[in-house]
């Protein structure tokens, strides 16, 4: 994520977001006791495949980042620092080489957690043009793309017409599916803080089904990011409404056979904090067979 105020927002809201998810789970349990639908069964996921370090806008150096993953007894993490216009990894070949070398050195010094060399690039326009080329991607093991401040026609200069905006978002994702070296789409449909805001329920189901079918066919992973509330905190959507709408999105993509990952999108001390992500997957009844298995990701 690229907004400059992200850390400040997270300091004030991370606890609230986690509490909202916990309260929602508590409400579901109470409803079950009253005879309504039973709560979703817990889904055991123990990876975090979208995280950041000091090589972009994260808070911690790589050695500490991996030490935290070991302390939290995660099975796997992906270090996915930003490879976007103006970022240090994109500007400096030397910095990119240093980044890869440091991940390799630190992960090789321990056996507790599987660590993947990754990056989070960004879409540059609605055609699926991207900020990371194939040559650099070939050096990586887990490549994510997002919509961010450089994504023309979506988060950058969004159309004033909400329907056109929603179509632009889906068409951008359809274009990204054609990028062979793309593994996953970061926090899909993160369009709540723009003007106009496009909420999960605003996306046309026919377009979503088209995208879901293509993601499943091309093996592109849907990133269920724990702090999705960040991307909607300026919208009129209440946190639990966001959860309910996002669950419906995930259900649609799961029905098409799309594979999912969970992530914290950690920028500070949230590594492994995927409580909301797992809640969404459980409520959407996503089977374990449609969750990424990091052990099967080839390391280079």
Regions found by a protein language model. Name each.
Residues 59, 85, 93, 142-234, ...:
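Divalent metal-binding pocket/active-site signature
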Residues 70, 136, 177-178, 254:
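Non-catalytic positions within long, well-ordered alpha-helices that form the structural scaffold/packing
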Residues 1-17:
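N-terminal secretory signal peptides and thylakoid transit peptides that target proteins
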Residues 41-167, 171, 263, 267-271, ...:
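A metal-dependent hydrolase metal-coordination microenvironment
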Residues 74, 140, 181-182, 286:
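A structural motif
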Residues 31, 35-49, 62, 135-140, ...:
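Charged catalytic cores and adjacent phosphate/nucleic-acid-binding surfaces used
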